Curated annotation (Swiss-Prot):
An example Gene Ontology molecular-function term: UDP-galactose transmembrane transporter activity
Positions of the UniProt region annotated as Disordered: 326-345
Subcellular location: Golgi apparatus membrane
The keyword Cytoplasm appears for this protein: no
Organism in which the protein naturally occurs: Arabidopsis thaliana
Entry comment describing in which tissues the protein is expressed: Mostly expressed in roots, and, to a lower extent, in seedlings, shoots, leaves and flowers.
Record's protein name: UDP-galactose/UDP-glucose transporter 2
Functional note: Sugar transporter involved in the transport of UDP-galactose form the cytoplasm into the Golgi apparatus.
Transmembrane region(s): 20-40, 50-70, 112-132, 137-157, 164-184, 202-222, 245-265, 294-314
Highest taxon above the source species: Eukaryota
Protein encoded by which gene: UTR2
Gene Ontology annotations of biological process type: UDP-galactose transmembrane transport
Membrane topology: Multi-pass membrane protein
Length: 345
């Protein structure tokens, strides 16, 4: 028998709600958190011209830990071995570092083109993650492709320059995409193979293990000293960072809820669509002129979303294996499942 894990989001029970309500609640939390995050980043990075990504992420980590503590989470609630989260954090920091490093070789439009394709490698890699082995129907790949193409068209219509490609930059951003794809699927696999895993555990352990990974590049690049001096001259920046971290915390927990309930690929589609929504809102709020290319991009994004939402097969539940782990009776089945679990953790 398949046992459903009870899920909740900031005290709101999700397990006893229909799927559409679960989706709406989690997506709303994600959009709220990251729209606030975008406003704060715009202020800190563009208005104040601060570019201390490692340091700001480091500060954000401590805010996360405090908020998790307020949620009542303690180490007694951890059900997975810490080595699982070492892998997770190493991949996360590697992706972050490669993305930041690629900016030295790729201009903004080129990086956006590559990062917008994230949902495709997430779907492809899902078939190779131990404990997951997820397969998707053809129409979902088409949906993802339309969404990606539409977002690229919309973004490049607003670009002040053409994409500038460099082989080193392409290799770095490709590595970041592969790590991003592995990260989302690994998180889903952890939720799948151990349904007792909570979103708070995932965020707590990833943060605790990830903080030392952040400290090394901060010291080696000297960013920690430059950031400390700059923020000492503008101490109100810490207030902005704390507010941003609180909003992003809501977004992060919502994303983990989406991964646990709907899978990594669906979550990647939502995070990709969020970029399009953010861009569209900036045009509506600041009344920027929309060109024909903007319209084409929006049309493709809408087609991708609609194609994803429309059921294409009456046998939909059978096309993707159920996420919760099911123990197979018999020695061979147990051994196979144990091998899957070992290779994951």
């Amino acid at each position: 028998m398949k046992e459903e894990q009870t899920r909740s989001l900031f005290g709101i029970s999700l397990s006893d709600k229909p799927t559409w309500q679960q989706f709406l609640i989690c997506t709303s939390g994600f959009f709220f958190g990251y729209l606030v995050n975008g406003v704060c980043e715009e202020y800190v990075y563009n208005r104040l011209q601060f570019s201390f990504g490692w340091y700001f992420t480091f500060i954000q980590g401590f805010v996360y830990l405090f908020l998790i503590y307020l949620q009542g989470f303690t180490t007694k609630h951890i059900v997975n071995p810490m080595r699982t989260y070492v892998k997770l954090s190493a991949v996360l920091m590697g992706s972050h570092g490669l993305t930041k490093g690629s900016l030295a070789y790729l201009n903004y439009p080129a990086q956006i083109m590559f990062k917008s394709t994230k949902v495709l490698p997430v779907m492809i890699m899902g078939a190779f993650i131990p404990g997951l082995r997820r397969k998707y129907p053809v129409h979902e790949y088409i949906s993802a492709f339309l969404l990606v193409l539409g977002l690229i068209l919309f973004t490049l219509a607003d670009a002040q320059m053409s994409p500038n490609f460099s082989m080193i930059g392409i290799m770095m951003i490709t590595g970041a995409l592969i790590m991003d794809a592995f990260l989302g699927n690994l998180q889903e696999a952890i939720f799948t193979m151990n349904p007792e895993t909570t979103q708070m555990e995932m965020l707590f352990c990833s943060t605790v293990v990830g903080l030392p990974f952040l400290f090394v590049p901060m010291v080696l690049t000297g960013e920690v000293f430059r950031a400390w001096t700059a923020c000492a001259q503008h101490p109100y920046v810490y207030g902005v960072l704390v507010f941003e971290a609180m909003a992003t915390f809501i977004g992060q927990v919502s994303v983990l809820s989406l991964i646990a309930l709907f899978g990594a690929a669906t979550t990647a589609l939502i995070t990709t669509a969020r970029k399009g929504v953010t861009l569209l809102l900036s045009y509506l709020i600041f009344t920027k002129p929309l060109t024909e290319q903007h319209g084409s991009g929006l049309l493709l994004i809408a087609m991708g979303i609609v194609l994803k939402m429309v059921p294409m097969d009456s046998k939909a539940p059978a096309k993707i294996p159920a996420r919760p782990a099911v123990r197979i009776a018999g020695g061979d089945g147990d051994r196979e499942e144990d091998e899957e679990r070992k290779s994951l953790v």
